């Protein structure tokens, strides 16, 4: 299967806002984005987390306040993008090996 056939699926929302009971989300992954572009963006998001996590692990800076929010929002964004790609995989029709 060619990666060019894989696109993001519709409906992946993230970053809850307002009262929890309302189940509202501020952002949604754009459907039909090419997998290669999404994977690059996920890689970029995860790269932003290297310094804060390393500094926290080394005891140089605690993972709190803005650093903690950076990690949380970046991970939620990356997860939503990957979940949309995984659902997009399910929508790709695979060739039948028996034909």
Write out the residue ranges for each language-model feature.
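Sequence/structural signature of long amphipathic alpha-helices
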Residues: 1-99
